[in-house]
Every structure is written in structure tokens, then in C-alpha cells.
Amino acid sequence: EQGANTYDFSHDRIRNVAYAEISPARRRSLHRRVAQALEQVYGVDSDTTSAQIAGHFEQAGDIQQALMYYQRAAEVTLRFFAYQDAIAMLNHAVSLVRVLPAGPTATEFELELQMRLCTAWAAITSYLGSEADAAYTRALELCRQVENKPHLFTVLWGLHEVALYRVEYEESRALARQCLEIATELGDPGLLLEAHHAAWGPYYFLGDYDKAFEHMQAGLAIYDRAQHEPLSVHYGVHDAGMCALYESTLALWNMGYLDQARSRQARVIALAKELTLPANIADAYSYAGLFCHLLRDPQETQRFAEPALQISTEKGYPFTRILSAVLMGWSLAMQGQLAEGIALARLGMDAAEEANMRLHTSQLSAILAESLMTAGRHEEAIEVLDQGIRRFETYRDLLCASDLWTLKGDALLVLNAGYDAVEECYQTALTLARRLGAKVSALRAATQLVKLQISHGRADESRCELQEIYAGFSEGHDTPDLRFACKLLEQQI
């Protein structure tokens, strides 16, 4: 002992014995004094010691003060992307709320903690796991007990995203409409941006591009990168402005506006260079890679998939890790690194299946199948394509859906499956693509069908249809798919 109120222990065991000898009342008093001393020393700069202060207040029996500092400590850990640490701390804090008397104070404390749990679970599961759903559902229950419209907006937005990732589009749209109503009522431009962000997602994945573009344009009219990028932490773990740009890029490609799509891709790349948050950068590069795959450009695909995969792996973002792994695998396979590329693409697809991922599964299945076919593994490719077709029939992921049948026809042709089986695949692909308004996919299917018929002396059967589809393109004639179709048509003149 050094003085009446100070202690110095040179060994943990001595300290523990001495601590046990102090009476509970004295112990609580000392913890309170330590907490208050730390507050005085660090003041407003107590972020680095907030967890320590929280622990002392908890041991002092001052639960409300402990909760305030645990909340602050969780915010600090979230800023450093330490999501698991934040979740552990927040769950402990939620357990402390149970010590408080039931009432508005306890409800408000738990709501603040649950909001941060929502943020953490959304980040580390990409809305794919049950944990994010449970966190948002509990937060919604709490929002109904207190009047907090901004928190209600955030919770409804999160539940919309959970529904979107489960391809429950009607539920997603209904929640997005509620977000629009609240944002309009509050008059907050940032919330209005995120409300449009919620609204365009289900329309995009349903292929209702006119309505999706309407909300995208409304959102982009509001969007300012410096002001609104930080919102991504709470809304989608990706930047709203970037989302509008890359989803419209993919939509324009699907509709056959290829030059406009490439122009929009240039905006994606330009904005990606300005983004500051790792999750947003990984997201931007993953989607840039998806578009480069559609353009059949493995070098450019690798240019974007590689940094996206590195960031996603380091930070633990499952959704972009899956996308970038499959894309990176394809790019390597197309450039001759077959074994490494296929292994990486399969790793991504296995992770997608484990996470029960439902968005982009058609394109990802096509990517893996193309990689396998490049290596001459056509039987395996057909297995992947059949699984992709089954997923499409269940989840209706539209982009590249008809390409699954086109690729299956290509694989069957190599395996000498017979004219009728191959033609059926191409015809199915063409019919589906035309029904979905997927002009590039329709062109691909029609091109392969004409090639097949030429080889069997029956070219006139589908040549006119290919001519009609090709004539429907007013731009993008220098892209690989249009160049190949044009060459094929010229050979038949």
C-alpha cells in the first residue's frame, strides 16, 4: 500500500488476491472512482478508453453509464471494421439492459444497441444470414415501442435488403414504399436517396428497368459522394450512387444499349476511384468485373476482380468475396491458368451455395461453366449449368439466365449429343431471351443456332431471325458478340 488510497501490485496473482479481499461495496466504489478518473483524463477523447470505462462502470453497478460507454466503444470498433468484436460487446451490453427496470429508458438503450448490431451483422453476412434478419426484426419490435422515425426508416431499409437477398421481391418493394413515405415525411435528402436506392433494387432484379431507372435517376439527382458515401455503413454496405451506376450499366447491356453501358461503366470506374470505404470499393470493382465478363474481356475482368477479392477477403465481406472469386477464376482460366482459375471459381460458387446466395446466380453459373468448358471439362460444365437452371427456375435471377441454355447447347455439341438435343437448348435460350428482353443473350442464342444449322445444311431456318435480332442493335457493333454475328451473317450472303 502506498498512501491511504493508492495501491501498487507487481504480480497478477497478488493483485487478484488483494482484489478479492476488498469488500463488494469498497470494490464498487473503487471502480466508480477509476471510471470517473478516466473520464476526467480523456474527456471528449475517450473513444480509445470507452470499453475500459464501460467495464469499470459495470463493476460499479452503474448500468446506464456502462451502457453509454459500451455503445461508444462499439461505434469505435465498427469504424475500424472490427465487426466480431463489436457484436460481442453489443451482445454483452444488451444483456445488461435486462438489469434495468422495464420501461422507456431500457427500450431506448436496447434500440440504440440493436441498431449497431444491425450494422455489424449486415456487414459480415451481407444480409445473407439469419443473424441480420433477427437483429432487424428485434429492432423493429423496439421501434414500435418508441417514436423514432429515423431509426424506423433504417430498420425498414434493412428488412427490405434482407428480403431482396432472399429474392422476396414483393416484400422488398412493400418495405421500400414505406421507406419512401418516411423519407418524404422527414424531408431528409440522404434518407430520400436511400429510399430510392431501396426502390430500384427489386425493380432491377425483376427486369422492370423503366421503373428501376426512374428511381435511379431520382437518386443520382440527390447523390453527392462526400456527403452520402458514409450512409452506406447503415444502408446496404455499398454506396447508393455506385449501385445506381453499375446496376444501370448491366441493365443497359441486357437491353442492347452497349455503348451507353460502356459509357456508364466509365462513370463506375471514375466514382470507384473517389470512394473511401473498403466495402464500397470492393463492391464497385466486383460489379465492374461482372460487366467486363459480359464483354468477354478477361484482362479487364482481372483488373477489377483482383483488388475486389483482396479487400473482401481481408475485411470479410462475403457477397463481394463470392462475386470477385468467381470472376477472378474465370479471368485466369480464360488466360490459360486453367487449374488455378477453375479452383478459384469453384471456391466462390461453393461459398455462394453455403451462404444460400440467390442474386447473380445465373451469371455466376455461366462463368464457372465457361471456365470448365475452356478446359475441356464439358460434362462438369453441364452439371453446373443444370444446377444454374434449377436455381433460375426457383429464384428467377434474370441476367444471363438464357445463356445457361446456350452454353449447355455448346457443351452438348462438343459431346456429340445429337442435333435435336443441341437445337432444343438453343431454341429454349432464344425463346427465353426474347421473352425477357435480353437482347445480347438472344443474339448469342440465335448465332449459335444458325451455326448449328449451317453445319447441318439448314441455315435458312433461323438466319432471318438472327438478321432481325442483329438489326435491332443501334450501337455496340464493335463488341465481340455483334462482330461474330455480323461475320456469320456475311458468310451466308
State what each model feature region is.
Residues V17, G55, R72-R79, S95, ...:
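Tandem amphipathic alpha-helical repeat scaffolds
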Residues V34, A66, A73, A86, ...:
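Tetratricopeptide repeat
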